[in-house]
From Swiss-Prot:
One of the record's GO cellular component terms: viral capsid
InterPro entries xrefs: HV_small_capsid
Protein name: Small capsomere-interacting protein
Organism: Human herpesvirus 6A (strain Uganda-1102)
GO biological process: viral process
Amino acid sequence: MTTIRSDDLSNQITQISGSSKKEEEKKKQQMLTGVLGLQPNMASHPVLGVFLPKYAKQNGGNVDKTAFRLDLIRMLALHRLNTKTGSD
């Protein structure tokens, strides 16, 4: 029976989570540019910070790009409305 040291185990976990983060970032970029048709520099917008991770997980190949775009427009409008209401 082989024993795995805790250092080896933590290194394996780090490798797995590192590749998962890379895949997640790749999905976010594909969603941003491919589905939404936005420039990569738009990823820093606070609404997109919430929007991208949520929908990148749901993106499964055959997607209705129009539905995602309409949802983004709705979220941007709500954000703008709340921002203006809060500053009055």
